[in-house]
C-alpha cells in the first residue's frame, strides 16, 4: 500500500459493502460527517478524508505551494489509492462538491455515483465578484475575518447557526498561509465552475440542497434541469449545509439514491 498524501479515516463495516468516500467543505474536517457515520455505515464502508491543511492535516507540510482544482482532485484520488479502493461512490459537501465533480471528471470509470450536498455548480454575478476579489478582501480584513464573513453571508438565518458555528470553529485550525492558499484558489472559481456546468457525464448524481440556500439553490436547479442522470432534492426550511442542519433528511435522501444506484449496478452485473 502506498503512503497517503492526506490523512483519512477508513471504516470497513462489511466486506460485501460498497465504498463511499466523503469530502468535506472549506474550513471543515472529517468531523463534519459525524451525523452521517451511523446511517451510512449501516449500508456502506466509509472513507472520510481530511482536505489539505484541514483536520488531521493541519500544520503539516502543504501538498503543493499553489493549489489547483486538478491538483487537489489528483491528491484525493491518490488518497483513495493509498486506502486500497477501486470503484467508489463520492459524497461532497459545499466546496467538497466541486472537488467531487473534479474527481469524477478525472476518473469517471472509478466513480459509481456522486452525492453533492450544498452543491456549488455556478456563481451568481454577486458571488462572481466576491470570488474574484476574495484574496484582496481577505488581505484587507484578515483571513479569519473573511471566513467569518463568508459564513454569515452563506448562512444568515437563525436556524443556520449550528452550521455557521461548525464552519467558524473548524476553520480555526487553518494557519494563515493555509487560508491564503485556499483563498487564492477562489479567484479562478467562476471559469472552473462554468466548465463543470457545461460538462456532460453519464455518472449518476444527486444534489441535496436547502430550500433557504439563497446563494446556490437556483443554480443547482438549473444544473439538474440541464443534465440527464441528475436528481435534485430540496430540504424545506433549511440552509446551505443540509447534512448538519437537517441530517435525517440528507441521510435518508442520499441513501435512497445510493440504494437505487447499487441496485442498478447489480442488475447490470447479473445480466
Regions found by a protein language model. Give the residues of each.
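Conserved HGGG/HGGXW glycine-rich cap/lid loop of the alpha/beta-hydrolase fold
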Residues: 9-62
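Active-site loop/oxyanion-hole signature of alpha/beta-hydrolase fold enzymes
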Residues: 38, 47-91, 252
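Gly/Ala-rich beta-loop-alpha elbow adjacent to hydrolase catalytic centers
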Residues: 92-96, 100
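Flexible "cap/lid" loop of the alpha/beta hydrolase fold
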Residues: 105-106, 111-141
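Conserved alpha/beta-hydrolase catalytic His-Asp/Glu region
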Residues: 125-127, 144-199
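Conserved serine/cysteine hydrolase catalytic core
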Residues: 184-225
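Catalytic histidine neighborhood in serine/cysteine hydrolases
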Residues: 225-241
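Catalytic histidine-centered segment of alpha/beta-hydrolase-like enzymes
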Residues: 238-251
Amino acid at each position: 500500500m502506498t503512503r497517503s498524501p492526506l490523512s483519512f479515516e477508513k471504516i470497513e463495516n462489511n466486506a460485501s459493502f460498497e465504498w463511499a468516500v466523503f469530502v468535506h467543505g472549506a474550513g471543515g474536517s472529517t468531523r463534519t460527517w459525524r451525523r452521517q457515520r451511523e446511517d451510512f455505515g449501516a449500508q456502506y464502508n466509509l472513507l472520510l478524508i481530511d482536505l489539505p491543511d484541514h483536520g488531521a492535516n493541519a500544520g503539516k507540510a502543504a501538498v503543493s505551494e499553489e493549489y489547483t482544482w486538478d491538483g487537489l482532485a489528483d491528491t484525493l484520488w491518490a488518497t483513495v489509492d493509498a486506502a486500497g479502493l477501486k470503484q467508489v461512490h463520492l459524497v461532497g459537501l459545499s466546496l467538497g462538491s466541486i472537488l467531487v465533480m473534479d474527481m469524477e471528471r478525472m476518473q469517471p470509470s472509478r466513480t459509481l455515483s456522486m452525492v453533492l450536498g450544498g452543491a456549488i455548480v455556478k456563481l451568481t454575478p454577486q458571488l462572481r465578484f466576491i470570488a474574484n476579489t476574495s484574496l484582496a478582501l481577505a488581505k484587507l480584513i484578515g483571513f479569519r475575518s473573511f471566513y467569518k464573513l463568508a459564513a454569515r453571508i452563506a448562512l444568515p438565518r437563525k436556524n443556520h447557526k449550528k452550521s455557521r458555528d461548525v464552519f467558524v470553529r473548524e476553520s480555526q485550525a487553518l494557519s494563515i498561509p493555509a487560508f491564503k492558499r485556499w483563498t487564492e484558489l477562489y479567484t479562478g472559481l467562476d471559469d472552473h465552475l462554468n466548465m463543470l456546468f457545461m460538462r456532460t457525464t453519464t455518472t449518476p448524481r444527486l444534489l441535496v440542497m436547502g430550500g433557504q440556500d439563497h446563494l446556490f439553490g437556483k443554480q443547482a436547479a438549473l444544473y439538474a434541469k440541464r443534465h440527464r442522470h441528475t436528481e435534485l432534492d430540496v430540504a424545506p426550511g433549511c440552509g446551505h449545509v443540509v447534512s448538519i442542519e437537517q441530517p435525517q433528511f440528507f441521510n435518508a435522501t442520499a441513501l435512497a439514491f445510493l440504494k437505487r444506484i447499487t441496485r442498478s449496478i447489480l442488475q447490470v452485473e447479473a445480466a
